[in-house]
Amino acid sequence: MEQLSLLDLMQATRGQLSAAASLDQPIDQICTDSRSLQPGSIFWALRGETFDGHDFLPQAMARGASVCVVDAAHADAATGPTLVVKDTGKALMDFAAWYRGTLDALVIGLTGSVGKTTTRDMIHVALASEFEGIRSRKNFNNTIGLPLSLLDADHRHEFIVLEMGAARIGDIAELAAIASPEVGVISAIGPAHLQTFGSLNNIIQGKGELLESLPTSGFAVLPGDDMILRQMADRAPCPVIFVGEEDDNHLRATRVRASYEGLSFRVDGVDFMVPVCGRHHLTNALCAIAIAREIGVNLQSVAQGLERFEPIDGRSRLRTIGSWTVIDDTYNASPLSVAAACRMLPDLELPGIGRRVLVLGDMRELGSAANEEHRRIGELAASLKIDLVVACGNHADEVARGAEAAGMDSHSIAAAPDLETVKAVLDCWLEPGDVILVKGSRATRMERVLEWLTERARLETAMRGEQRRYCA
């Protein structure tokens, strides 16, 4: 963050500063977690569903907070200088929106039902070859995370990529009002957060708020092979760039091939190789390339940048655990992302490859559509000739029903109520050379399957070592 004064902060938030504070005191760091606060930082006491930052005011002051931003109801709780605001959450949004107005950087807003974080990181890599920029922290994509990510920027940065999440109509509009993006990207549209959105039409309405927020001088990038997204383009008051494989896209990929080595394709005569697992990442990469091309980045530089792309753990990351090839896609799951992940399995061509195994936890937040969506995944797994399906959770039976109804042998399907049962099934079923896709919603914590696989592989290696020592 650029160095500002308490006067700037007070004016941006319309707060009241206590007499103990000095208006010209410089500030350049905001902290919302008292445990990581550095001396001289502003402590912003936020409220969440399971915490209240006001409970940690004494700790923040003890660690050297220069000023604490507090709600009016807690004005007397801090022993040191305070900035009193009506609501600390709203004040953070107001401050970030004000700060956005001081920046010259190109702000890129990104949303979508799936693929947001991967697309965000690809955009950053694509532009970083020629420009200095930053992206949202981790999965900071709500009314707390986006402002904090925006406040990370300073005068050195020429672009900012901000991820925008949504669970209901109005969420994206609220975030866009803070960020004032000049470029908008929607990575995909599908049934995610149906429990709160209520319907696919509401998801379309909500995600499209990003397009409506763009200035006429900006531009949008949309996957043009998706008819829903094509129809949404009319909501943008600025030019729209369509990307995809079809002939009528403004930026078109040819010679597309997904393999164990990664995703290869050609754009405008330039060959790309992105080290990601799965053809579905093509759209993510094309969105990044389109933005880079539009702002004048050399495509050869973009190709070199994307060749160094590193997927985040839990997001289609290919790993070798013992004798198995594992696709770690454990970060989250929705019908769209699970279907895309399942389609990765047939693409993997490895020497001595064994069976293809799907280990799936529940897809959460689907509301009344949950049973049907889980059955569809079972049907898809059968149609893709996946060899073994192990489903875990409240909707495991629906996945199993779908797979069996679509022709999969019942002896190749397991519906497990819990993780311990999953481990027991895999312990019996797995063979050397198997390719295992592990996926599930965040709440299911399917990374525990990877931890178990790692431990099992370690024990097998140790046992082989003991056997060799004994035989010798």
Model regions: which residues?
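Phosphate-binding loop of NTP-binding sites
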Residues: 10-11, 91-219, 224, 230-236, ...
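Active-site regions of enzymes building and remodeling cell-envelope glycoconjugates
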Residues: 78-87, 237-242, 410-413
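Residue-level signal for inorganic ion chemistry
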Residues: 9, 41, 60, 95, ...
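ATP-dependent carboxylate-amine ligase
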Residues: 1-18, 39-42, 52, 121, ...
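Short secondary-structure boundary segments
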Residues: 70-73, 188, 224, 393, ...
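Acidic-glycine-rich active-site phosphate/pyrophosphate-binding loop
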Residues: 119-124, 252-271, 314-319
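N-terminal leader/targeting and accessory segments in enzymes
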Residues: 1-94, 98, 366, 379-380, ...
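Alpha-helical segments flanking ligand/cofactor-binding loops in enzyme cores
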Residues: 35, 58-59, 173, 201, ...
